[in-house]
């Protein structure tokens, strides 16, 4: 599902970025992306093993936005962790979609975290992004094609 989802987003002219809290080096992740035939669909990747902060720190999200040359309003973050992914992305001004992960439990946090979308699967992000793009274009007075 990951490849078809990323391809559908790329076909819409969207950039794909990765921001990962990890102890592994970039080479490890690149091998995984090549193994899964995803490497050609990823435009930028930022790993906490290479920067002085990790999600949910604002600078982690700013780093991936900078790597993609995007503003927060132009980006959507998809993740499975309410605190690290949703809260962190929203604090920098991005929209955030949550894919609840059964192995992570309810991930209770001390503050209210409300994702902009909750997805049952990764593939659902395509329809959500299509809707958000139409809303974004309408707010700017443009017509989506």
What does each of the following model-derived ranges do?
Residues 3, 7-10, 17-145:
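Asp-based, Mg2+/Mn2+-dependent phosphohydrolase catalytic module
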């Amino acid at each position: 599902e990951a490849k078809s989802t990323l391809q559908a987003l790329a076909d819409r002219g969207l950039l794909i970025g990765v921001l990962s809290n990890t102890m592994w080096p970039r080479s490890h992740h690149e091998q995984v992306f090549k193994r899964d035939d995803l490497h050609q669909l990823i435009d930028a990747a930022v790993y906490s093993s290479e920067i002085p902060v990790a999600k949910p720190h604002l600078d982690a999200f700013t780093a991936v936005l900078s790597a993609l040359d995007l503003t927060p309003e132009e980006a959507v973050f998809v993740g499975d962790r309410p605190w690290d992914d949703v809260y962190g992305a929203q604090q920098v001004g991005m929209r955030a979609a949550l894919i609840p992960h059964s192995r992570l439990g309810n991930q209770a946090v001390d503050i209210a975290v409300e994702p902009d979308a909750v997805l049952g699967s990764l593939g659902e992000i395509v329809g959500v992004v299509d809707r958000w793009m139409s809303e974004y274009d309408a707010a700017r007075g443009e017509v989506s094609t």
